[in-house]
A protein has these predicted regions:
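Soluble, non-membrane globular domain cores that form compact, hydrophobic packing
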Residues: 21-105, 111-184
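C-terminal motif of bacterial Sec signal peptides marking the signal peptidase cleavage site
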Residues: 15-19
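Positively charged n-region of N-terminal signal peptides that target proteins for export
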Residues: 1-4, 8-9
Length: 184
């Protein structure tokens, strides 16, 4: 009897260890600032550029920062997030090129209702594509979905956006490019 019990316990341990072995990372449980931070941390020193993030109250000078979703005008002016869609998100973060935001700007957003993601993507795309650019023109816009409720947008220099997209897709299993458009 002891032998059977020992064997059953050993099998249970083996299966529990195997179940913990590979965990999917689809971004479903990551906060927006964590999403951008995980991607930023994959950049090698020669790939990095002067970048900061966050809003005026959560500003960082060396990487992504939390963005207060109650700053409706700031979300629109700095990240291209449509003011009319702010009610759809609970949390946000940003990563922006410090010399020129049109060279690279990324925002990550947690969408309250997964059923609203498709509508939000269209609103974001329209808002960014219809902007009047003042200081240089970004080349490319991407919007990527992570899990059911997280959306990441980025616009800027085509090469920098391509690097960001590649890194984002490699960090998050199942991430999907929902929009990729030329802004020229």
């Amino acid at each position: 009897m002891k032998r059977i019990l020992t064997m059953l316990l050993a099998l249970a341990m083996i299966f529990s260890v195997a179940a913990c072995g590979k965990k999917s990372n689809d971004g479903a449980n990551d906060k927006p600032v964590d999403v951008l931070t995980k991607v930023w941390e994959t950049y090698k020193d020669d790939e990095k550029f002067a970048a900061g993030g966050g809003d005026a109250n959560n500003m960082t000078m060396d990487g992504p920062g939390k963005y207060d979703v109650s700053d409706v005008e700031g979300l629109d002016a700095q990240l291209g997030f449509p003011q009319a869609s702010v009610a759809l998100i609970e949390d946000a973060a940003s990563l922006v090129h410090m010399m020129n935001a049109n060279t690279f700007t990324a925002g990550a957003y947690y969408v309250s209702d997964a059923n609203e993601v498709e509508l939000l993507v269209e609103d974001m795309k329209d808002n960014i594509m219809n902007r009047q650019w003042i200081c240089g023109f970004p080349d490319t816009l991407i919007i990527v979905g992570l899990g059911d409720n997280t959306v990441v947008s980025a616009f800027g220099n085509a090469e920098i956006i391509d690097t960001f997209k590649t890194k984002l897709l490699s960090v998050y299993d199942g991430a999907k490019v929902l929009c990729e458009e030329s802004l020229n």
